Amino acid sequence: LVENPGNDVLYFLSFLSLSIIDENNILGVVMKDTFLRNLVCLCTVFFLLPTHISLAEVDIIKDVLQTIDFTKEMCVVSEEAIQKTYGDDPFRLPFFNDQLRNPLETPSILKNNIDYCIANRDSIRNVHWYTSYRLGYMVAAYPQYEPTFDHRIVESAPLLYAISDIYTLHQKPLSAYSFSLLQSKTKDIPVDVQKEIAKVLYASMEFELARDKAFATASELDLIKAFRNPAAILMEDGWDEITYQIASDANFGQLYFASIVLSHHLDAFLQILPSLAIPDSTSFSAETPMGSIQIHPAKDTLHTGRNILFSLDLGGNDTYLNSAGGNDSWFNPVSICINMTGDDTYEVQDPSVYSQGAGVFGFGALVDMQGDDHYKSIQYSQGFGCFGVGILWDQNGKDTYDCDNLAQGAGIFGIGILHDSAQSDTYHTYSFSQGFGYVKGFGLLMDDQGDDTYIANDEDVAGTNPQSSDHNTSFCQGAGFGRRADLAEGNSMSGGIGMLIDMQGNDTYSCGVFGQGTGYWAGTGVLYDQSGNDSYKGVWYVQGGAAHFGIAMLMDDQGNDTYDALLNMAQGAGHDVSLGYLIDREGNDTYTSPNLALGGGNSNGLGFFVDAQGDDIYQLRRTNATNLGKASCELFPKTSWRYG
């Protein structure tokens, strides 16, 4: 017994429970003679841990395990047993396997990754590099060795010759007459501005070449089909063989190397842009085989054009009814939209348009540098990547983000990033958003400051959730999701990485089923809130709850926080060889908890709940519940449930 420095309403310390299941010994535990051969579930609830000390360094965990002759080294999940049971899965991420081998190291592993993102949050290039690295691609490791394209710049007319080179690349060289017309259009743009834009254009050309090589084994017809329906393979009740084959054969490393280099040059352009002397009246437009290149004057502008390669708006309260940093076709592989100032509106009503920082078999980036902005779309937007990279980078302002699904930092076979730097923002969606990663995907949402509101709508219920028709399937706010097919044709695909990082402010989070740090089918989901008095409200598999080989963590460092979960498997809970963590490091917190919560493990699941400090209140929704460090088993699994 360890003395509690706080005045918790309920006192619990170091519970550990065992049950009898797991004929395949998937947990891979080495048993002593005094224990039964088949070990089942491990779940613990730890209080009184030193603040800001990683779990890997806390001796109390090791001490508790040793009371039953169970060491940290024995607490592993057998990759061989999983492979034997479910077959080989080429989509499983090394990042997932690292945590599978070291379940008790997971908080330290994830926190180190969070710290990297925070430290590099001002660099599009570095954040993008991190996401590709965690997907298993060690490329572009040293920025100083990345191509600069300086040798290709024609100092007297950089933009003119860069555009001419685009035509030459596509075997459509400009005629002398067209070259002369273009020359007259570019001459009034300051040369230093031309030079910086030209570097971005050369990086875009290199990206197109790399993109074509990355998908060289796929037929043009298959690529067009996959481009038109990027979510065809998302749901378990459907099967898209074309997308599966493209994903199996694609050279993602080559793709991401080129997109990181492009991000590097975009960073450089954004850094120098405020110092460039660009007249407010500057206006320019030119068509190219990769899309149009545009500069808009500092006034209120209505943007409706499509297939845009590069767009720079110098100011004004603008309205974008177009893709705004989303690539519109296979032949528009790169789309970059930069807005310098103004309170802007970005709105797309067509669900087939990739917009507001979306890259589908391409690279899409929207950068808004200042102003109170409004972003609205149906799907495939606001930092969405599918076989590509999509980035929305908002540097200042009180903003609102609204979408239905697959947005706000969502990646499926790709990378989606949304970063908002300042002020209080509102994020609204229904599903598969706000830090969502599907197979071979990484979705990241980062917010630096402000009292933010994150909503995964659970009031307008669609009635399609397999757990409860009264709630929506969310997979939002830090969710990793994979395709489970052991009950179907067998083509299971391990999930990706979903991460939401909020650094400051009193924030509010709400979702339905699966959210707020959740993982499913070898997916990893993380929600990290650094400071503020925050509120978390969810339904099922939330707040560090995972199912079916998933990994989930919700970590809150500071503040007096409120956690409310309605149904099973929440607040540091793992089901079916899953790992769930809820870690609150400081503050006087309130927990309202269902069954199998606050350190709950079921069917070989591992659940950990850690409250390090403060005067806390624990309210249980039912008596005799399997929570607060208890484990259980399912003798008769409900196999008709798709998600748990």
Locations of regions flagged by a protein language model:
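Bacterial N-terminal signal peptides that target proteins for export
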Residues: 32-40
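Bacterial N-terminal signal peptides
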Residues: 41-51
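Long, solvent-exposed N-terminal ectodomains/accessory regions
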Residues: 57-206
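N-terminal segments that cap or nucleate solenoid repeat domains
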Residues: 261-333, 496, 500
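Well-ordered beta-strand segments characteristic of repetitive beta-sheet solenoids
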Residues: 292-296, 308-315, 329-341, 358-370, ...
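Hydrophobic "rung" positions of tandem beta-strand repeat architectures
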Residues: 294, 302-303, 311, 320, ...
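Extracellular beta-strand scaffolds
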Residues: 299-302, 316-320, 326-327, 342-346, ...
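Acidic/polar low-complexity surface segments
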Residues: 352-357, 435-436, 455-491, 517-518, ...
